[in-house]
């Protein structure tokens, strides 16, 4: 072994001695998460992010965050099996402005619907809204006994399943194709699409538990601040839904240099 100085000893002091413990939360800030105006409860919670430091800007860390919220919390309701995904698209002051990003049913609800002695029918379709959002909708329905039926099972024939699936796809395409994202979300909240499918398929085979079980966001148009502000009731138009109830969030401040979109008709 070569003779020389031991570098560890000459540095002095114990290894890792007196390391200053810094609380990580002292460098972070809380931001309010705001839901769009389609929902009754606007203030859905808070999120944490590191403060702006050098080139790392806090608002960039918040954009793109996805929040999963139960519809019961958004509507102050008891029906809690539907979950909505909201994505943070812009930051105004201490508020994160979110937009619709997807919908899902809870696992326990899906499991409770699947039973013996009935046929499960599923369908999915890719549809584009009038304002350029490409959505993938998944639908599920189950056959039920006819009135005065004695037989235990209620299985649909393969031809009937195909007819019902075709009807599901037609109704989902029609409901989304002719509306913008805001109107589509307004239909997903009470699940009027599922009720329409159930009514339309009665002549083929009686159904129950028909739901749009999942909505995926596949493609979005280019981000426009004006449209997002309209969703949050700041567009200046009367079309923005006004939230009701005492638990509604405060109005969001306008961005610096924000101008409302020019209206075609007055």
Swiss-Prot record:
InterPro entries: Ribosomal_eS1 (IPR001593), Ribosomal_eS1_CS (IPR018281), Ribosomal_eS1_euk (IPR027500). GO terms for biological process: ribosomal small subunit biogenesis; translation. Pfam families: Ribosomal_S3Ae. It comes from the Eukaryota. It is found in: Cytoplasm; Nucleus; Nucleus, Nucleolus. GO terms for molecular function: structural constituent of ribosome. The keyword Cytoplasm applies. Residues 233-266 are annotated as: Disordered. Keywords: Cytoplasm, Nucleus, Ribonucleoprotein, Ribosomal protein. Residues 244-257 have a biased composition (Basic and acidic residues). Its main location: cytoplasm. GO terms for cellular component: cytosolic small ribosomal subunit; nucleolus; small-subunit processome. The keyword Transmembrane does not apply. Component of the small ribosomal subunit. The ribosome is a large ribonucleoprotein complex responsible for the synthesis of proteins in the cell. Part of the small subunit (SSU) processome, first precursor of the small eukaryotic ribosomal subunit. During the assembly of the SSU processome in the nucleolus, many ribosome biogenesis factors, an RNA chaperone and ribosomal proteins associate with the nascent pre-rRNA and work in concert to generate RNA folding, modifications, rearrangements and cleavage as well as targeted degradation of pre-ribosomal RNA by the RNA exosome. Component of the small ribosomal subunit. Mature ribosomes consist of a small (40S) and a large (60S) subunit. The 40S subunit contains about 33 different proteins and 1 molecule of RNA (18S). The 60S subunit contains about 49 different proteins and 3 molecules of RNA (28S, 5.8S and 5S). Part of the small subunit (SSU) processome, composed of more than 70 proteins and the RNA chaperone small nucleolar RNA (snoRNA) U3. Belongs to the eukaryotic ribosomal protein eS1 family. This is Small ribosomal subunit protein eS1. It comes from Salmo salar (Atlantic salmon).
